[in-house]
Regions:
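Positively charged, amphipathic and often flexible ligand-engagement surfaces
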Residues: 1-333
Length: 333
């Protein structure tokens, strides 16, 4: 068993409160105000953010009503609290219609889901707030991209979507949007998917992500490059952005809140990373939850997908232990 597999095994069996503790730096809190405050702190440092309400899969109509209210409340808060450089908001289609995942695919009222998504996009557009359709597991990929295509054809420009490099289908999905101009986040993806539809090894996923970023840029889309991998970023910056003279207005780099990449982020932001000498927008993912259950589910998936975060969490724990428990003893040496 490799070290990363061992960490995934540990993550799969430890209780929820420990999961939340290890992943504490990666969740803004348990109310909207916590996320807004975190986004404001990033804004003061020149860092953009995207806010996400954790939780998915509406089980009944009241869940949908609540999700609509919460998304509208978040849109209102972003519009009122930020004059410039407003955070974007990530939204999940599974919160906006009751769906059931079956062997034959997703059973859902697609028209109702579309109506609810469009209502939020229209509401956000009036408030000048940008939205993103978050990507969930493979059951939701078709519906999410169908909705995004309809929104683009209707002329909405305040919406983006996500493409995952682990899925075999992604190159075909990119070709689908060749005659439209959209905003796409290119990432590996957090959901472990079956081997008949997805790559299983991270190095191959990173190779595919490089290709997908290239294809998206070539097609004229705005690309959100979502990775912490310094080597992958170096390849993208050297062989794509610099070599093809891509202006910084065509892309941005996205990372998770809490992952220790401050030096790398700083170099990218001031135009000192590799041979690309222009300042680049940096956006951090700011998730928050209204319940510990939703936070635990996200944190466990995140730790499983990125085992290195377990190491970061352990270091954070030891740092806190050193600065809270050991500090009184140092004073009396």
């Amino acid at each position: 068993m490799t070290y990363n597999r061992f960490k995934r095994f540990i993550v799969s069996i430890i209780p929820g409160f420990m999961i939340r503790f290890l992943a504490r730096p990666y969740v803004a809190g348990y109310c909207m105000e916590d996320a807004i405050e975190q986004a404001r702190l990033f804004d003061e440092k020149g860092i953009l953010s995207t806010i996400d309400i954790l939780g998915e899969d509406a089980k009944k109509e009241s869940d949908i009503t609540l999700a609509l209210e919460r998304y509208k409340g978040l849109i209102d808060a972003v519009a009122s609290e930020f004059k410039d450089n407003k955070p974007t908001i990530s939204m999940k289609p599974s919160n906006l219609a009751v769906g059931r995942e079956t062997q034959k695919g997703l059973l859902i009222d697609k028209k109702k889901c579309m109506r609810n998504v469009e209502a939020l996009i229209k509401y956000a557009d009036k408030k000048r707030v940008e939205m993103s359709l978050d990507m969930e597991n493979h059951f939701w990929t078709d519906l999410t991209l169908d909705i995004y295509e309809i929104l683009l054809k209707k002329g909405y420009t305040n919406t983006g979507a996500v493409l995952q490099s682990r899925l075999f289908r992604t190159e075909k999905d990119i070709k689908r949007f060749k005659n439209l101009k959209g905003r796409f986040r290119s990432c590996i993806g957090i959901y472990n998917e079956p081997e008949d539809i997805a790559l299983q090894k991270k190095p191959l996923m990173k190779v595919e992500m490089f290709r997908h970023v290239n294809q998206l840029l070539h097609a004229g889309h705005y690309v959100e490059i979502a990775t912490h991998d310094k080597r992958l970023l170096a390849d993208i910056f050297d062989d794509l952005l610099t070599a093809k003279k891509i202006p910084s207005s065509r892309f941005e780099v996205q990372m998770l809140m809490g992952v220790p990449r401050r030096l790398l982020q700083g170099k990218i932001m001031i135009g000192r990373f590799r041979s690309y000498i222009k300042p680049v927008r940096m956006r951090l993912y700011v998730p928050f939850a209204y319940s510990r259950k939703d936070a635990t589910a996200y944190c466990r998936r995140r730790l499983m997908a990125t085992p290195d975060i377990v190491d970061f969490g352990a270091k954070n724990f030891l740092w806190n232990l050193d600065h809270t428990i050991m500090r009184p003893f140092r004073r009396h040496r």
